[in-house]
Each structure stands twice: as structure tokens, then as C-alpha cells.
Amino acid sequence: MSNIHKSLALRRTISSSAFTMFMLVAMVGLFSLFSIWSINRAWIEGTKHTVQMDSLSRAALDAQVSFKVQVQEWKNILLRGDDPALLEKYLKSFHAHALQTQENISQVKLEASVLGMNDLASEAEKLVDTHKSITLRYETTLVEAQAGAAVISATVARKIDVSLRGVDRDLENSIGLFADEIVDFAIQERSSLEARMQDRYFTLRWFIISVIGFSLVITAYVLTRALRATRT
């Protein structure tokens, strides 16, 4: 009978140990699967937002570049406007980059609105209006000074330059600061995403390590009981 009792006690101990280990493994597995799913979902959503911010920053930087080129082409008009062919060439380029600047800033406005960044969208809208006003002022001044002539003389070019000198400076600075602000936003979003993913990874890792340690302790305890049961 004593051997039978020992055998039953050993079986109960082994069964209890197996059940405990099964529950621990199942718990670790389920939590790990949920954590991986959660991390993956957060990563996908965060990456999507980061990509949108990168697109926003590229549009702002493109607007900054295209406006600088537009201003440079205006200077070329004044410097080389005494040649009809060059005047036509630089006028076309001036208008093309003016349109490109408008499109880039408008894209920033649209994407900022989609992201719920209403302050940036409002700021972009103001830049669009200011740019339109300055471009129109360039064009009107040129037409009036040119007075139907096929070229721009050096004297006329100097008068135009004096009347419009520095008119682009505030807008260029505003677009530059605007672009820098958006780039900083994009960098912060990327850094925040990386930090969140790192925190979740560390949480999952330490949980698994803790459960494994706890499992080893439980296993050692159950095995100790099993050994004692075989000796009594």
C-alpha cells in the first residue's frame, strides 16, 4: 500500500507540474503573440504617419528650393533681359518655378490638413497668398517697365531692381523657417516612434524573462516535492 500511495503521490505531483508548466507556456505564448501583434500594429501606424510627415517635409523643402530658383530667374531676367531669346527663356523659367512653388506650398497645406495639423495648414495658406501677391507684383512691374518693348534695357532693369529690391526676402525667410519647422516635426515623429517600439520591446523581453524565471522556480519546487514523495 505504501508503494501505491507513493506512486499516486508521484503521479499527482508530476501531473501538477505538467499542468503548471503548460499554463505558464500557454500564458507566455499568448502574451507574446498579443505583444508582437500590438508592436506590429503600432509600427505600421507609426510608419504610415512618419511617411506622411516625410512627404510633408519634402514638399516644404521643394517649395523653398523652387522659390529660390524663381528669385534667381528674376535676377537673370534683369541681368540678361537685353537679349530677346534669353529674356523669353528666363521668363518661362520664372513662371514655371512660380507655379511649382505654388503647387508645393499647396501640397503642404493639403497634407497638413489631412494630418490634422491645422496651424501648419493655416500658415501654408498664408504663404500661398503672399507668394501669389509677390509673383503678381514682379509680373506687373515688369510689364509696366517694359512698356511693350521686346527687351529690357540696363536702365529699365536698374529701375525695376530698385523698386523691388528685398521684396522677396521676408517670404524666402518665412518659407525657410516653415520648412525647418516641418522637418523638425518629422524628425521628432520618427524618434518618438523608435522610442515607443524600443519601450515595448523591453517590456516584452523582461516579461518573458520573468515568466521563464518563475517557471524555473516552480519547476524546481515541483521536482523537489516529487523527490520527497518518492523517499517517504
Task: Show the residue positions of the predicted features.
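Amphipathic alpha-helical segments and their boundaries
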Residues: 14, 22-69, 84, 88, ...
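Individual transmembrane alpha-helices with interfacial aromatic-anchor signatures
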Residues: 55-59, 155-170, 201-205
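Positive-inside N-terminal membrane-insertion signal
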Residues: 1-23, 197, 203, 231
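Transmembrane helix-loop junctions and nearby membrane-interface residues
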Residues: 33-39, 77, 220-227
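Selective recognition of signaling/oligomerization transmembrane alpha-helices
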Residues: 189-232
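Generic alpha-helical transmembrane segments of integral inner-membrane proteins
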Residues: 19, 23-30, 213, 217-221
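Heptad-repeat alpha-helical coiled-coil/4-helix-bundle sensor or tether segments in soluble regions
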Residues: 64-71, 91-159, 170, 174, ...
